[in-house]
UniProtKB/Swiss-Prot annotation:
Keywords: Carbohydrate metabolism, Hydrolase, Magnesium, Metal-binding. The active site is at 8 (nucleophile). GO terms for molecular function: magnesium ion binding; phosphoglycolate phosphatase activity. Homodimer. Mg(2+) 3 binds at residues 10, 43. Its EC number is 3.1.3.18. It catalyses: 2-phosphoglycolate + H2O = glycolate + phosphate. This is Phosphoglycolate phosphatase. Mg(2+) 1 binds at residues 8, 174-175, 178.
Length: 224
């Protein structure tokens, strides 16, 4: 029996313009009323996921920066990684490449966001990996992360917090940066707009996209 759903935000609950699906909100609230714990896992910053938790009524902890930091139900913020090294890397690379800071870095605590011109991506990726960092593009922003800082880390943290088995957890996501949590032995589902890699490892692929899929997924797994 599934007891917890860990859900990505951009492209999973939102459309191409990053507007949240009202149908997704209704489905989440219906499932929560039946006892499901819902957690959001986003690449965005804590102020954003905190606001989503409060205004959408999410009943579980929410994670920002792809699992690097969490806002818990007791009102505390728990930081699992540092951005000291990633910020220094950005500062260094910005002097030699087109890698440059973005607005949301003023709120980031566990990772670093950036923009970059396409011709510099391979070089910066190799430099990052040689120093124990990982870079990826979420479809909305470039992220510079510490190794091991990903959504699988967040799901494992939830598993520990709620004393769950993997088969009691459902993950829902749409893009390749969700893949770490899809590689865990959990239940997996995705919207129709998901990447082929995510679809290939999903237990259920919805006919609907951009948040409209949440109700169908929850019904498939008998959560509402």
């Amino acid at each position: 029996m599934i007891r917890l759903a860990a859900i990505d935000v951009d492209g999973t609950l939102t459309d191409r313009d990053r507007l949240i699906s009202t149908k997704a909100i209704e489905s989440i609230r219906s499932a929560e009323k039946k006892g499901l714990t819902v957690s959001l896992l986003s690449g965005n910053v804590i102020p954003v996921v905190y606001a989503l938790k409060i205004f959408l009524g999410i009943n579980g902890p929410v994670f920002g920066e792809n699992g690097g930091i969490m806002f818990d139900n007791d009102g505390s913020i728990k930081k699992f990684f540092s951005n000291e090294g990633t910020n220094k890397f950005l500062e260094e690379m910005s002097k030699r490449t087109s890698m440059r800071s973005i607005l949301t870095n003023r709120w980031r605590e566990a990772s670093t966001g950036f923009d970059i011109d396409p011709e510099d991506v391979d070089y910066v990726r190799k430099e990052a990996e040689s120093r124990g960092f990982v870079i990826f593009y979420s479809g909305y922003s470039w992220h510079l992360m510490n190794r091991g800082e990903d959504k699988a880390f967040a799901v494992n943290k939830l598993k520990e917090m709620y004393s769950l088995e993997y088969d009691e957890i459902l993950v829902i996501g749409d893009s390749n940066n969700d893949m770490p949590m899809f590689q865990l032995p959990v239940r997996k589902a995705c919207p129709a707009n998901a990447t082929d890699n995510i679809k290939a490892v999903s237990d259920f692929v919805s006919d609907y996209s951009y948040g409209e899929e949440i109700g169908q997924i929850f019904k498939h797994f008998e959560l509402m």
